[in-house]
Amino acid sequence: MESLFSTMIVLLLVSFSCLISTEALTSNYGNITVKWDLLNWTPDGYVAVVTAYNYQKQRSIPGWKMSWRGTKKEVIWNMLGAKTTGQGGCSMFKGNIPQSCVRKPTVVDLLPGTPFNQQIANCCKSGVLKPGSESAFQLSVGSAGNSVKTARMPANFMFTAPKQQYICGPSKNVRPTRFTTADKRRITAALMTWNITCVFHKAT
């Protein structure tokens, strides 16, 4: 009888823990959703647009940072609308040097007034992300998979902001995003789309 009671307690605790984990990523106060849209394959990887949406109802982000761990030995060849904070060791490359060879890169937004040829839509706001707004950047990833079967989602994703701590769930492969051209006469779709959901944890 005592053994049965102990088993029931353990099951209740596990269920409660799962409930907390589920609720944490479906907060009534909204969340930060980060979407990776893979747009083109390259000889050694892909080009993607990464967009962060602030679905929080009342919390503004004063300056975001994103980081993740590559599941292969990926490098970031170049970026538009954002930059990595460190290049890392790229000594194995000759001639064309990647922007970052760091296994877990950290990315920050560019400043307003960035030259137009370094921008994309919804970038360059110093990382400020107001409720209901979005921020985006483009990156070219190399030494990565270049097909639906071989491209790998980022792991250990982190979204940070000054005096704000967030908890991010795992990357998920979702239905590819559809895009409408400016003249509204053509619809295209991403090759693949990955989603990461992050929720506010506490002020720091």
Swiss-Prot record:
Checking InterPro entries in the record gives:
COBRA_pln (IPR006918)
Query: Does the keyword Lyase feature in the UniProt annotation?
Result: no
Keywords (alphabetical) are: Glycoprotein, Signal
Query: Where is carbohydrate linked to this protein?
Result: 31, 195
Task: Say which domain of life the source belongs to.
Answer: Eukaryota
Q: In which tissues is it expressed?
A: Expressed in roots, stems, leaves, flowers and siliques.
Which positions form S-S bridges? none
Q: Where is the signal peptide?
A: 1-24
One GO BP: response to oomycetes
What are the record's GO terms for cellular component?
membrane
Asked whether the UniProt record includes Glycoprotein among its keywords, one would answer yes
Family label: Belongs to the COBRA family.
More info? COBL5 appears to be a truncated member of the COBRA family due to an in-frame mutation that introduces a stop codon. This truncated gene is actively transcribed.
Q: Which PANTHER family match?
A: COBRA-LIKE PROTEIN 5, PROTEIN COBRA
> Which protein is depicted?
COBRA-like protein 5
Report the source organism. Arabidopsis thaliana (Mouse-ear cress)
